[in-house]
């Protein structure tokens, strides 16, 4: 069965309560459940992972090698700071989709640069939590080979 890995980075465990005027009321658990149902509808296995620690995220990316077809990642603040995360994603040679709930380009200037975007297969910003749905749909229809 094809497989996706959904990774959420720092502070995304606070979805639903952290700055709801920016991120909405949907919790991370809601996002993961919705994503699992949607992936299942496409016949895709979905694994989820969230950490506030860069090294743990890098370790999880490394462990995906050989059994994950596509990574969907909302790297949170690591987007703008982590060369290590970029190197991990490039190093495992697994295509990935970068997702951001808010439009990072309409926010503070330090959020405008991503260390990942030039290596991502697709980038979804500013769609709210619908961005996760769109990423799964794109992966299912355009990135995963059906056997």
UniProtKB/Swiss-Prot annotation:
Keyword annotations from UniProtKB, A to Z: Lyase, Quinate metabolism
Pathway: Aromatic compound metabolism; 3,4-dihydroxybenzoate biosynthesis; 3,4-dihydroxybenzoate from 3-dehydroquinate: step 1/2
Enzymatic reactions: 3-dehydroquinate = 3-dehydroshikimate + H2O
Record-level Gene Ontology MF annotations: 3-dehydroquinate dehydratase activity
EC number: 4.2.1.10
Gene Ontology terms: biological process: 3,4-dihydroxybenzoate biosynthetic process; quinate catabolic process
Active site: 23, 100
Pfam families per record: DHquinase_II
Feature type site, description Transition state stabilizer: 18
Residues engaged in binding substrate: 74, 80, 87, 101-102, 111
SUPFAM superfamilies named among the record's database cross-references: Type II 3-dehydroquinate dehydratase (SSF52304)
Self-association state and partner proteins as the record states: Homododecamer. Adopts a ring-like structure, composed of an arrangement of two hexameric rings stacked on top of one another.
Family, per entry: Belongs to the type-II 3-dehydroquinase family.
Function recorded in the entry: Is involved in the catabolism of quinate. Allows the utilization of quinate as carbon source via the beta-ketoadipate pathway.
Name of the featured protein: Catabolic 3-dehydroquinase 2
Origin organism lineage: Eukaryota, Fungi, Dikarya, Ascomycota, Pezizomycotina
């Amino acid at each position: 069965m094809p497989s996706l890995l959904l990774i959420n980075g720092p502070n995304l465990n606070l979805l639903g309560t952290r700055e709801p005027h920016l991120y909405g009321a949907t919790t991370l658990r809601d996002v993961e459940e919705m994503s699992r149902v949607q992936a299942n509808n496409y016949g895709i296995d979905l694994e989820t992972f969230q950490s506030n620690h860069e090294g743990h995220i890098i370790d999880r990316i490394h462990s995906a090698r050989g059994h994950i077809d596509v990574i969907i990642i909302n790297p949170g603040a690591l987007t703008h700071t982590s060369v290590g995360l970029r190197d991990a994603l490039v190093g495992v040679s697994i295509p990935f989709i970068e997702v951001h709930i808010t439009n990072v380009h309409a926010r503070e200037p330090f959020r405008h640069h991503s260390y990942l975007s030039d290596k991502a297969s697709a980038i979804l910003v500013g769609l709210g939590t619908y961005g996760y749905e769109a990423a799964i749909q794109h992966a299912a229809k355009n990135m995963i080979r059906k056997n």
